C-alpha cells in the first residue's frame, strides 16, 4: 500500500514540476525550452470513497505542493516557484493530474494522465496568466532516483 502511495507521490511531483517551471515564449518560430527540478514539499491522499486505507482506489485524490528550482541536470539552483496540484486516481495504474504553478511573472496551468510505473511522461501546458497568458506546449517529465524519490526533472517546451 505505501509503495503505491510513494509511486503516486513521485508521479505527481514530476508532473507538478514539469508543467509549471516555464518562462514565456520568445519571439520567432523557435520554442522556448526550460529545464527545472521539482521537489515534493508535501501532500495528502484523500480517501474519497472511504475504502479504509487499502491504498489509493478509483476516485481518490492526492493533493500536493512542490518547490521548483533552477537546474542544470546536476546541481539544484535557487527556488523559482511553487506548484499546487491534484491527481485523481482513474485506474489502479493511472491518475489524471491538474495543477497550477506560481512563478514571479504569472501562473501556468497544466494537465495530463500519468502511469504510476512510467519513468518518463508527457503533459500539456494549457495556458496561464501574466507573462504566460498565451502559453501552450508540452512538458517531458523524468523521475529521478528510486521509486521513493521526491524529485523529478522536466523539460518544458513552449510553442511560439
What are these regions (language model features)?
Residues 1-9:
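Bacterial N-terminal signal peptides that target proteins for export
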Amino acid at each position: 500500500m505505501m509503495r503505491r502511495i510513494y509511486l503516486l507521490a513521485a508521479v505527481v511531483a514530476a508532473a507538478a514540476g514539469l508543467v509549471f517551471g516555464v518562462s514565456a515564449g520568445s519571439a520567432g518560430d523557435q520554442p522556448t525550452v526550460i529545464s527545472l527540478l521539482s521537489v515534493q514539499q508535501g501532500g495528502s491522499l484523500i480517501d474519497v470513497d472511504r475504502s479504509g486505507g487499502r491504498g489509493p482506489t478509483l476516485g481518490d485524490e492526492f493533493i500536493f505542493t512542490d518547490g521548483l528550482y533552477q537546474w542544470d541536470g546536476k546541481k539544484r539552483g535557487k527556488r523559482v516557484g511553487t506548484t499546487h496540484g491534484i491527481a485523481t486516481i482513474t485506474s489502479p495504474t493511472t491518475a489524471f493530474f491538474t495543477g497550477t504553478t506560481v512563478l514571479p511573472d504569472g501562473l501556468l496551468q497544466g494537465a495530463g494522465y500519468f502511469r504510476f510505473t512510467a519513468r518518463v511522461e508527457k503533459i500539456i501546458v494549457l495556458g496561464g496568466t501574466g507573462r504566460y497568458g498565451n502559453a501552450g506546449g508540452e512538458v517531458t517529465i523524468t523521475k529521478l532516483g528510486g521509486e521513493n524519490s521526491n524529485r523529478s526533472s522536466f523539460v518544458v517546451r513552449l510553442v511560439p
